[in-house]
From Swiss-Prot:
Pfam families per UniProt: Peptidase_M24
Annotated SUPFAM superfamilies: Creatinase/aminopeptidase, Winged helix' DNA-binding domain
Cofactor(s), by name: Co(2+); Zn(2+); Mn(2+); Fe(2+)
Species whose genome carries this gene: Malassezia globosa (strain ATCC MYA-4612 / CBS 7966) (Dandruff-associated fungus)
Residues reported in the UniProt entry to bind a divalent metal cation 2: 231, 300, 334, 429
Biased composition (Basic residues): 55-71
Name of the molecule in the record: Methionine aminopeptidase 2
Superkingdom of origin organism: Eukaryota
């Protein structure tokens, strides 16, 4: 779910006052934490940066016993459509590790270059102890995303309605994540943006739109476990005309993932993305198209229970943007390409909303607004939602109250974002975790 330039500024201001333990989202006292990270076999074998040579010289202690590690192993196959919860498939509570990439150590600050591998592994343990975080939370969310999206890729066909597609993805997500209030559930509404619409479209009640064979469909959905959100997106087309557009955007996203890392400057990441994206051009319908970055859409960091944490990752060069990525942060690296002008504006009926992380204290004069805010706090907190989710909860005649919450700054609306009519847009996105010892692309799969 992308950040616009305007939304990024607002998120940055909110971050200054943000506490990861929002009262609305507080987990029950006494809740048990998941398995400790050192039980994950894959991670134990991940060398810390600069540690490989030391390992070669280190002598193995005679008679030393290695602690037996748990591995991520599914004990059953998933159904079609997906319906088996992940905790039943992985009963030991250990979920598949994402793609591990080593950092480019030349980008590290001097202070970090002096840190030993042992110290980095200790930091990794400490990060997981903070607020009860465990890497298996976000890995569980990522495995849900992989299984649901791969079924969606096999199933989505022209002739299906947008509502049918959204329900299929969200029903699968709810089943596999074993939805349980703020403990686990949907991370944000399923985006199904078509053609020139790049982001933030999901069908409202009564939407009759049908997927056509010539459409370019962006599928963007999120999964959360204990507030750790996996945000990942892909694009589908059903005719080969715009295959080169999809290839350009996918390559740009992979470039962003490669360039990201501890101490990486966000402006430099954006410049690398733009260079790759805009090196592509192709012929379609008798015209030559240079792929353009949609310059006012950006990637972003992800905070607990907040899809936009406060930092934005541009997809174009931004001179003098020296903000750095930091150890322990989670980022959504997403890029958007267009055959249009490379700039989006609000377009069409709004469906996406989110309560502000730190809403202002205002007097709500409309009764329906007060009631609706209670429903939002109880069911979503600061997580994004859509009108269909309110319908599902039995809310009725809520539009006046919803508009009042938006006008008072309590709720932020996210209208569909579109480039010029007639153009095509594409999106690919991955969630990455900047661990002390390595970069983990948690949402990576065989599909993208």
């Amino acid at each position: 779910m992308p950040a616009t330039a305007e939304a990024a500024d607002a998120a940055t201001q909110a971050t200054d006052a943000f506490s990861t333990k929002l009262e609305e989202n507080k987990l029950p006292e006494g809740q048990e934490r998941g398995p400790e990270e050192e039980e994950d076999d894959d991670d134990d074998e991940t060398p810390a940066p600069g540690d490989a040579e030391k390992k070669k010289k280190k002598k193995k202690k005679s008679g030393a016993k290695k602690k037996k590690s748990k591995t991520a192993k599914a004990v059953m196959e998933q159904t079609e459509p997906p319906s088996i919860g992940l905790t039943k498939m992985f009963p030991n509570g250990v979920f598949p590790v994402g793609e591990v990439q080593q950092y480019d150590e030349t980008k590290f600050d001097e202070s970090r270059k002096r840190v030993t591998g042992e110290e980095l592994r200790e930091r990794e343990r400490l990060i997981q102890e903070k607020d009860g975080f465990n890497y298996n939370f976000i890995r569980r969310a990522a495995e849900v995303h992989r299984q649901v999206r791969q079924y969606a890729q096999r199933t989505i066909k022209p002739g299906m309605s947008m509502t049918e597609i959204a329900n299929m993805i969200e029903d699968g997500t709810r089943a596999l994540v074993e939805v349980n209030g703020f403990e686990s559930g949907i991370g944000f509404p399923t985006g199904l943006s078509l053609n020139e619409v790049a982001a933030h479209y999901t069908p409202n009640a009564g939407d009759k739109r049908i997927l056509q064979s010539g459409d370019v469909l962006k599928v963007d959905f999120g999964v959360q476990v204990k507030g750790r959100i996996v945000d990942s997106a892909f694009t589908m087309n059903f005719e080969p005309t715009y295959d080169p557009l999809l290839a350009a955007v996918r390559a740009a996203t992979n470039t962003g993932v490669k360039e990201a890392g501890i101490d990486a400057r966000l402006g430099e990441v954006g410049a690398a993305i733009q260079e790759v994206m805009e090196s592509h051009e192709f012929e379609a319908e008798g015209k030559t198209h240079q792929v353009k970055c949609i310059r006012n859409l950006q990637g972003h960091d992800i905070a607990p229970y907040r899809i936009h944490g406060g930092k934005s990752v541009p997809i174009v060069a931004v001179p003098n943007l020296d903000v750095k990525m930091e150890e322990g942060e989670t980022f959504a690296i997403e890029t958007f390409g267009s055959t249009g002008r490379g700039y989006v504006v609000d377009s069409g009926e709004c469906s996406h909303y989110a309560r502000q992380a730190n809403p202002p204290h205002v007097s709500l004069r409309i009764n329906s607004a007060r009631q609706l805010l209670y429903t939002i706090n109880k069911n979503f907190g600061s997580l994004p939602f859509c009108r269909r989710y309110l319908d599902r909860l039995g809310e009725q005649n809520y539009l006046l109250g919803l508009r009042h919450l938006v006008s008072q700054g309590v709720v932020q609306d996210y209208p569909p974002l579109a480039d010029v009519p007639g153009c095509m847009t594409a999106q690919f996105e991955h969630t990455i975790l900047l661990r002390p010892t390595c970069k983990e692309v948690v949402s990576r799969g065989d599909d993208y």
